[in-house]
């Protein structure tokens, strides 16, 4: 999969073209009878989306996601509240536009020649390719030529249907497929890993995130080249919403907000490692339950799951771990660092975790205040790995090479240069293994994504199982299942082998529709 990147050039060109086309409607705040005026009079921006880890998701009741965050900022830009409606599939999204139930679709939708005949696209903000997926261990097709409707199923409204039809007409006359009107792409990927379906097609970003929780999902081949992703709004004579979107994205591009959001949601990399991810998820089941209380106890200012990811990157949750350089323990502390933190036994898991957190907090406190709050942790982790002085060198090098020293996206690209003589010879603190610091932070981010998604899935599986058990045994209510006298989790561990493995996802699907007011 190609590196994901916001298409700034496309935004710039589109801005110029649309500015000319939309010039009569640019002063949209001054009109009383246009789409923007209607949104402001209503006091809310109605956005329809789908539930995926990238577009819209929730943790502890709090919404997040790339499209959600952009939509929230756009609503703030317009001075209105955001109303989010979550639909099951893409067809339902466009129904919302057709029926006047949405102002915008913000759901990672691909720009497509057929779609723009009936709907107004906005600026593009990243790109994806469409890929055929299968389950590891099953037959991997090398071509679409002989795939049949019994093997290949796609979601309703999926843009790839047009591409498949073109391929059938021009290259693979035997190709056939079916559309499942009741399921979205995420649910079809679940069916593939459950063995209910041979193949489906999804976009490369969705697949990459899905694999963090389900490494058994594999890419067979690319169906399309990279395609721009955009929002859609109604296509009519009123261009005020398009003009507002254009202004909004230009402003986000110019002040660096788009780059920061790209790094936040797409910056975890796309170099998926099946064995590493599978090994990590097995450790989540086998080792994490004993360590979780310690991570929760000492996490303090950071999410405990991030702390767990850091510890796994350091030692694979092995309290006895020792490296050739002499660092030891769960958080792999040097002897000098441990002494400065008052640690008497580096191989004691609690002492190591407590000390590691304090050391990380010290690094956090040194990160310049000019660095955005949600990026400070990455600078601190780089400093944790290679030393604070070398992190300062990385920032200085970034500034010298016309990057933004306060942007993690810019700084991390310069980290490998710290080990190259033409660069480190001119830096204050000299040589550093910057490439290792880069990999260190990237790995932690991947482990965190996997852990958050996997724990969410297990929680939902437990809830579903509880409800099913209550139906099977009506005398036991769902609330009773969590009490000591009915050890539900123990029951599950004995009765369901899937409970202790990365079994089919519930994280990536939401049936029906939901509405959230923000």
From Swiss-Prot:
GO terms for biological process: cell wall macromolecule catabolic process; cell wall organization; peptidoglycan catabolic process. InterPro entries: Lysozyme-like_dom_sf, MltF, Solute-binding_3/MltF_N, Transglyc_AS, Transglycosylase_SLT_dom_1. Residues 22-269 are annotated as: Non-LT domain. It catalyses: Exolytic cleavage of the (1->4)-beta-glycosidic linkage between N-acetylmuramic acid (MurNAc) and N-acetylglucosamine (GlcNAc) residues in peptidoglycan, from either the reducing or the non-reducing ends of the peptidoglycan chains, with concomitant formation of a 1,6-anhydrobond in the MurNAc residue. Pfam families: SBP_bac_3, SLT. It is found in: Cell outer membrane. It is an enzyme of class 4 (lyase). Residues 270-518 are annotated as: LT domain. Residues 1-21 form the signal peptide. Murein-degrading enzyme that degrades murein glycan strands and insoluble, high-molecular weight murein sacculi, with the concomitant formation of a 1,6-anhydromuramoyl product. Lytic transglycosylases (LTs) play an integral role in the metabolism of the peptidoglycan (PG) sacculus. Their lytic action creates space within the PG sacculus to allow for its expansion as well as for the insertion of various structures such as secretion systems and flagella. PANTHER family: MEMBRANE-BOUND LYTIC MUREIN TRANSGLYCOSYLASE F (PTHR35936:SF32). This is Membrane-bound lytic murein transglycosylase F. It comes from Escherichia coli O1:K1 / APEC.
């Amino acid at each position: 999969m190609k590196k994901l990147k916001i298409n700034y050039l496309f935004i710039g060109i589109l801005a110029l073209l649309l500015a000319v086309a939309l010039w009569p409607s640019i002063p949209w705040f001054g009109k009383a009878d246009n789409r923007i005026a209607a949104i402001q009079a209503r006091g809310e921006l109605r956005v329809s989306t789908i539930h995926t880890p990238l577009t819209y998701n929730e943790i502890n009741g709090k919404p997040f996601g790339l499209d959600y965050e952009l939509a929230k900022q756009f609503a703030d830009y317009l001075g209105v509240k955001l109303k989010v409606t979550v639909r099951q599939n893409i067809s339902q999204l466009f129904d919302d536009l057709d029926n006047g139930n949405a102002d915008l679709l913000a759901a990672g939708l691909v720009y497509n020649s057929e779609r723009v005949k009936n709907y107004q696209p906005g600026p593009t903000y990243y790109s994806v390719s469409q890929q055929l997926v299968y389950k590891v261990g099953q037959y991997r097709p090398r071509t679409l030529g002989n795939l049949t409707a019994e093997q290949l199923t796609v979601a309703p409204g999926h843009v790839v249907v047009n591409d498949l039809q073109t391929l059938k007409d021009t290259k693979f006359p035997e190709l056939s497929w079916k559309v499942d009107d009741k399921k979205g792409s995420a649910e079809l990927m679940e069916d593939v890993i459950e063995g209910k379906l041979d193949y489906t097609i999804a976009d490369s970003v969705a697949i990459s995130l899905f694999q963090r929780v389900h490494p058994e999902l594999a890419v067979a081949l690319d169906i399309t080249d990279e395609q721009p992703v955009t929002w859609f709004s109604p296509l009519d004579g009123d261009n005020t919403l398009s003009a507002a979107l254009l202004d909004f994205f230009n402003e986000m591009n110019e002040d660096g907000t788009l780059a920061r959001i790209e790094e936040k949601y797409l910056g975890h990399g796309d170099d998926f490692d099946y064995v590493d991810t599978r090994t990590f998820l097995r450790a989540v089941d086998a080792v994490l339950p004993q360590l979780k209380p310690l991570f929760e106890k000492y996490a303090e200012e950071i999410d405990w799951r991030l702390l767990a990811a850091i510890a796994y990157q350091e030692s694979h949750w092995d309290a006895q771990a020792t490296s050739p350089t002499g660092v030891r323990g769960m958080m792999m502390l040097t002897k000098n660092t441990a002494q400065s933190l008052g640690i008497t036994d580096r191989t004691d898991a609690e002492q190591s975790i407590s000390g590691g957190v304090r050391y990380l907090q010290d690094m956090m406190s040194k990160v310049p205040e000019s660095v955005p709050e949600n990026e400070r942790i990455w600078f601190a982790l780089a400093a944790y790995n290679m030393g604070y002085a070398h992190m300062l060198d990385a920032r200085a090098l970034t500034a010298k090479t016309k990057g933004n020293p306060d942007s993690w996206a810019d700084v991390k690209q310069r980290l490998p240069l710290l080990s190259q003589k033409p660069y480190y010879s001119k830096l204050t603190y000299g040589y550093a293994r910057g490439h290792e610091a880069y990999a260190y932070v990237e790995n932690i981010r991947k482990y965190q994504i996997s852990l958050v998604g996997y724990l969410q899935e297990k929680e939902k599986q437990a809830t579903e199982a509880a409800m099913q058990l209550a139906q099977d045994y009506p005398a036991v209510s769902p609330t009773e299942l969590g009490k000591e006298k009915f050890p539900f989790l123990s029951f599950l561990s004995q009765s369901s082998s899937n409970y202790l493995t990365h079994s089919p996802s519930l994280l990536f699907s939401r049936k029906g529709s939901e509405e959230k007011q923000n």
